[in-house]
Structures are given as structure tokens and as C-alpha cells.
């Protein structure tokens, strides 16, 4: 399992994985809109300071997606890194390591991870 920054060629496969994982997530009350997801991923890939991080198995199949951004704090010029969205079947540890590497590369002083409000299958608690 490897994690790295994804590119435009990964968007279709990342969208399919997110759709599959969405069906069993705490977000199922919201309708999954694949066209909107593709548009958002394209924006993330092309925007400086934002990245689509992917975990892929040995066959190159995407197993996890972590959308990340690095920005300045509102109150000072120091930088922080945060996740926008994190969906993963496998390779979560590798994704977090890649996220930490990316944060360091962009000079982030702090990493802030969002935690889902609702975790019906207790996956988040088991992961962390």
C-alpha cells in the first residue's frame, strides 16, 4: 500500500471509491452527486495549497482519499494543514503519513483533523 498526491487521471476512480464508501457513512442522508464530486476534485488538484492524497494498493487501485489544504491561520501568518474530507477503505496509516509529509513540506506548524460528528459503525474510533 502506497500513498501519494493524486492527479487529474485519478479523479474518476477516486469519485467511484467515495461513492461506494458514502453508502455506508454518516453522510448517507446527503445525496451523493458524482458530477459535483468530480468538479470539486478538479478544483483541489489545480489549486495551490490543496491536494488530493490517495492510498493505492499494489495493483494501483485507489483504496483511500484524503483531501488536504494548507493555509495561514486567521490570527497570524503561521500555516496549518487540515483535511477537507477523508474516506478510506485501506491505507489510512499511509495516507496520514503522506498528509504529515505534505504539511511539513508546506511549512505547516500545526495539523488539524476534522472528526465526523456521527460514526454509526465506530470506524473512526477504531482507526484513531
Give residue spans per PLM region.
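Conserved acyl-CoA
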Residues: 94-110
Amino acid at each position: 500500500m502506497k500513498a501519494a498526491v493524486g492527479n487529474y487521471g485519478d479523479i474518476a476512480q477516486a469519485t467511484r471509491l467515495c461513492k461506494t464508501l458514502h453508502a455506508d457513512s454518516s453522510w448517507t442522508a446527503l445525496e451523493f452527486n458524482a458530477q459535483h464530486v468530480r468538479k470539486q476534485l478538479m478544483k483541489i488538484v489545480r489549486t495551490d495549497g490543496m491536494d488530493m492524497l490517495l492510498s493505492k494498493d499494489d495493483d494501483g487501485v485507489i483504496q483511500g482519499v484524503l483531501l488536504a489544504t494548507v493555509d495561514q491561520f486567521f490570527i497570524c501568518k503561521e500555516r496549518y494543514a487540515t483535511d477537507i474530507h477523508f474516506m478510506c477503505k485501506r491505507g489510512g496509516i499511509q495516507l496520514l503519513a503522506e498528509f504529515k509529509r505534505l504539511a511539513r513540506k508546506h511549512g505547516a506548524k500545526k495539523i488539524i483533523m476534522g472528526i465526523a460528528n456521527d460514526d454509526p459503525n465506530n470506524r473512526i474510533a477504531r482507526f484513531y
